[in-house]
């Protein structure tokens, strides 16, 4: 099934999971370290430059951001985990919010876990993947920023990601800059939905 994105809009920004949209519209969530490229991925697959605000400053997304796609499903941008420069209390609040969302949200159809292709998965990446597996949530692992590496280096790095996360198959390779992986990602999204 081919997924064509004709319409995409920011539906809402939430700081509390009790405020999230009600109803049964399917949701696909994006999870990953701060600054891994979640906003850039949203903009690229929706073919919109500034739909999701991206920043070179880690920890820009501090809320759960809902994007309504084709009036049919939500893409949900979760706060990045990892090295955001915020207080311990703020990090704990984000963690609790994300954990509650992932464990309680009935509309959730799957999670796209993003990793920077240039770096070996860290402890938080491994914990996230294992936790999603424990919750039995379908996970698609996407290696972002592929344009930063040569084709040969890409293969080496995705093999490391696959081995470290103990994945049954290679992660999808994606670049918001070059457009590599866009169609493959849309096909994978269509399957999750």
From Swiss-Prot:
GO terms for molecular function: GTP binding; metal ion binding. Residues 24-193 form the EngB-type G domain. Necessary for normal cell division and for the maintenance of normal septation. CDD domains: YihA_EngB. This is Probable GTP-binding protein EngB. Keywords: Cell cycle, Cell division, GTP-binding, Magnesium, Metal-binding, Nucleotide-binding, Septation. One of its GO terms (cellular component) is cytosol. It comes from Syntrophomonas wolfei subsp. wolfei (strain DSM 2245B / Goettingen). It holds the Pfam family MMR_HSR1. GO terms for biological process: division septum assembly. NCBIfam families: GTPase_YsxC. Belongs to the TRAFAC class TrmE-Era-EngA-EngB-Septin-like GTPase superfamily. EngB GTPase family.
